[in-house]
Amino acid sequence: MKDIASYKFIERLKQLSFVDEIWLFGSRARGDNQERSDIDLAILCKDAKDSDWLRVMDIVDNADTLLKIDCVRLGKKSLSKGLYNNILKDKVVLYAKVKN
């Protein structure tokens, strides 16, 4: 199985100026996934506008994998506390913007 961080769509996401961090969570982060398990991503983009998030979703929708990708936006208050806690418990940081 290909390393999640090596997918081209992850590289494209990292190039977006408003993306601060990309986290893998869920079964793939825990290592108890099946071959066809989905990819769960949490993307922190504190300063992104809704139109910026649409760019993220376009990249995800056109990803270089046939696996299903579930993507949640961090930095919005819409996540339930339970989901956020599960993300924090499982998270593997795939990318973190270098702060100057």
Residues of each region from the PLM?
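Catalytic core of pol beta-like nucleotidyltransferases
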Residues: 1-21, 29-35, 46-100
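Short, well-ordered beta-strand segments
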Residues: 40-42
